[in-house]
From Swiss-Prot:
Lineage of producing organism: Eukaryota, Metazoa, Ecdysozoa, Arthropoda, Chelicerata
Cellular-component GO terms for this entry: extracellular region
Coiled-coil residue windows: none
Protein name listed in UniProt: Evasin P1170
UniProt keyword list: Disulfide bond, Glycoprotein, Secreted, Signal
Length: 102
């Protein structure tokens, strides 16, 4: 009896977790106020014998080395996060002022 109750509770917990993950995932897909972009800088980076990583150049020094744990090589990537929710929506008069004048 106790085993059946425990199994039932486990199944209920997994179902609740699955529903939660589904709703969080679909909510994140509809979030258009945030943008996260990644660009390859055209170079790779390697770990030297002293443990330091070779520097990444490009994008005015904003490229960083990203690598997996235990690997001695990685990619130089430029990442940028933009939160558009911090900017107000333009109003009609602001849009009219941006039109080219004859």
């Amino acid at each position: 009896m106790e085993l059946k109750t425990f199994a039932f509770l486990q199944i209920a917990a997994f179902i609740a977790l699955g529903v939660q993950i589904f709703f969080v995932g679909t909510d994140a897909l509809g979030d258009e106020d945030q943008l996260f972009s990644v660009e390859y800088c055209g170079t790779n980076c390697t770990q030297q014998d002293d443990g330091k990583w070779t520097p990444c150049s490009g994008k005015n020094g904003k490229c960083k080395c990203y690598h997996e744990d235990g690997k001695r090589y990685g990619l130089c990537l430029y990442t940028e996060y933009t939160d558009f929710s911090q900017y107000p929506n333009p109003e009609g008069s602001e849009i009219e002022n941006t039109r080219p004048r004859p």
